[in-house]
């Protein structure tokens, strides 16, 4: 990589970092769908990974995780202990598992999105729609990576505590997890796929000029 490209990538990474931070702490990180607010904070991570590569994707995901850690530590809600080891809500407190939930899925968002994008491009070689389909698949895959890993890690590491804190439940906790994945995760993945296609294609055109 020449110096010019390296500088360009660092500037783009800084812009994506700024977007993630702004979206994490303002309403810009959410799109109202009527029945829910779709989280789109992970979209800059996905797009950054596609444009800059998996290493930058992992870095941007780490920034997303750090904003989540800070927010859940300093602006806690009843279930913030699953995202921060520094939070204790009544009889429930966070631990090392909280850091795993907060950081690992977010770091993997960009890495998964990048390799899905490249894999679909290769699989559809020769198709006029290959880039559009690959971008949509990367957006959906990156979003679902976050949702599926976060919610399943919550269940395996804090199942009973999360059920009690969130819904006052001691049984049927995984049904709640599945409900959240279906009601929140799937619409968010669709939105992420649409935004990834629209924004990344526009960025590709700008970068070619």
For each predicted feature, which ranges?
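Loop-helix junctions at membrane interfaces
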Residues: 1-209
